[in-house]
């Protein structure tokens, strides 16, 4: 059975809720953390501090799904799913998509030297900036975020190619598996007391199935 380590932000935590250890074709270990952005990534420090994941958003018991970063080993296949928070909240303010993409690849290749790295492009942006209602995040238009998303992906693929990373899961593949052309507010869950940019369970399950399919193809 293939061993897959997955690291990412809150969207990965939500996807992990649908993984069944005893009824699956691949062995997956999930480390997802809410609001984790590429600019904060320092894998050496995360190993040193043994940083904890957020765990599952819908927890069956306290700390359900919470694991230390030391459980992410450099000996198998690594799926990395970061960038959503950067595109949503920060790139429009700083205009540094190229720098962020470069930092991301350097962190991955400098730390996971023995892994087969698969980069998952960031979850596509929602058409509406949902967190604006609580003042949690600055508000940027859909067009602004799409522009930054495009810049980031262009640089990401350039630096990944230079580093010898060939395996990607594209945003277009994520949208295709969901059967939509874009992410809209009606697709978000209502588990929080305010609007959040998190997908409903039925969509996260489809994304998990896409990840499993891609893992089996490697």
Give the positions of each predicted feature.
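Short, conserved phosphate/pyrophosphate- and ester-handling motifs at nucleotide-, phospho-/glycolipid
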Residues: 9, 196, 200
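Phosphate/oxyanion-binding active-site loops and adjacent basic polyanion-contact surfaces
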Residues: 58-61, 199-207
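Alpha-helical cap/lid subdomain in secreted, periplasmic
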Residues: 68-197, 206, 214-216
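Conserved alpha-helical elements of sugar-nucleotide-dependent glycosyltransferases
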Residues: 11, 152, 203
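Short, well-ordered alpha-helices that flank and scaffold nucleotide-derived cofactor binding pockets
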Residues: 17, 21, 158, 209, ...
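Short, Lys/Arg-enriched, disordered terminal segments
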Residues: 1-2, 213-218
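Conserved SGNH/GDSL esterase-like catalytic core that processes O-acyl groups on lipids
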Residues: 3-103
């Amino acid at each position: 059975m293939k061993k897959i380590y997955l690291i990412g932000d809150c969207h990965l935590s939500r996807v992990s809720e649908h993984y069944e250890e005893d009824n699956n074709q691949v062995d997956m270990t999930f480390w997802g953390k809410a609001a984790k952005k590429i600019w904060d990534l320092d894998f050496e420090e995360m190993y040193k501090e043994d940083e904890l994941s957020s765990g599952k958003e819908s927890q069956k018991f306290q700390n359900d799904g919470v694991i230390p970063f030391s459980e992410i080993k450099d000996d198998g296949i690594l799926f990395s799913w970061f960038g959503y928070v950067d595109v949503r909240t920060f790139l429009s303010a700083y205009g540094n998509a190229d720098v962020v993409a470069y930092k991301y690849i350097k962190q991955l290749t400098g730390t996971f030297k023995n892994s087969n790295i698969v980069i998952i492009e960031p979850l596509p942006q929602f058409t509406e900036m949902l967190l604006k209602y609580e003042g949690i995040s600055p508000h940027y238009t859909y067009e602004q975020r799409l522009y930054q998303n495009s810049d980031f992906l262009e640089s990401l693929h350039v630096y990944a190619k230079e580093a010898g990373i060939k395996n990607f899961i594209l945003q277009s593949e994520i949208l295709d598996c969901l059967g939509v052309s874009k992410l809209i507010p009606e697709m978000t869950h209502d588990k929080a007391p305010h609007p959040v940019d998190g997908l409903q369970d039925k969509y996260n399950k489809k994304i998990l199935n896409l990840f499993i399919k891609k893992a089996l193809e490697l």
